[in-house]
Amino acid sequence: MIGLINGQVQYLMAPTACVMTTSGVGYDIELPLPSFCQLRLNEQASIWTHFHVREDAQLLYGFIDRKERDVFRQLIKINGVGAKMALAMLSAMSAAELKMHVEQDSEDALTRIPGIGKKTAQRLLIELKDKLKNIEVDSSHLEFAMQPAPISAEGSIIAEVEGALISLGYKEREAQQAIKAAKSNGETFADTQSLLKATLQQFQSFK
């Protein structure tokens, strides 16, 4: 089983990154958006991974923080929560935020995540209480770090962010509305990561 990959980031297309190790092997890894936003093209990265096997594919999911991977593994143990939904949950909020919402029985916070309705949220709150209570996540920073990244054309940035959100389960209209709201104050975004961060924050104000 592949548990940790160290290498140079060769390619970034949210939510997938390709990381090449010193042996010359490149691994395509899907990451929750907060982890994805910490990667930089052509820079070194250490990514904790979960190897996921389906009938039609073998996939690697990656996380900057090992505890985030622990939370992901607990999520996919729950009946009805697949890897895609777990990735969407950890894209909509950090592992620390998820644990906080579970401890506070915050049903509304979970229903903001694409694919999670009221009944599913209620069931998740019950099942996650025991699963997450022994996982110590870093709650000192609920906002993920952002650094300047190479400039891309604005149209490409918007298209990439929209595609990333849709791949995680958001509807096209929801993704477009969130992007529009993020840009409503006239701010310009020079890179995908900064627009992703601003767009994800908009979902917190929806519903």
Swiss-Prot record:
Keywords tagged on the record: Cytoplasm, DNA damage, DNA recombination, DNA repair, DNA-binding
CC terms in the record's Gene Ontology section: cytoplasm; Holliday junction helicase complex; Holliday junction resolvase complex
GO molecular function term, any single one: ATP binding
Region: Domain II, residue numbers: 65-143
Record region (Domain I): 1-64
Region: Domain III, residue numbers: 153-207
InterPro entries recorded: DNA_helicase_Holl-junc_RuvA_I (IPR013849), Hlx-hairpin-Hlx_DNA-bd_motif (IPR003583), NA-bd_OB-fold (IPR012340), RuvA (IPR000085), RuvA_2-like (IPR010994), RuvA_C (IPR011114), RuvA_C_sf (IPR036267)
Function comment: The RuvA-RuvB-RuvC complex processes Holliday junction (HJ) DNA during genetic recombination and DNA repair, while the RuvA-RuvB complex plays an important role in the rescue of blocked DNA replication forks via replication fork reversal (RFR). RuvA specifically binds to HJ cruciform DNA, conferring on it an open structure. The RuvB hexamer acts as an ATP-dependent pump, pulling dsDNA into and through the RuvAB complex. HJ branch migration allows RuvC to scan DNA until it finds its consensus sequence, where it cleaves and resolves the cruciform DNA.
Name assigned to this protein: Holliday junction branch migration complex subunit RuvA
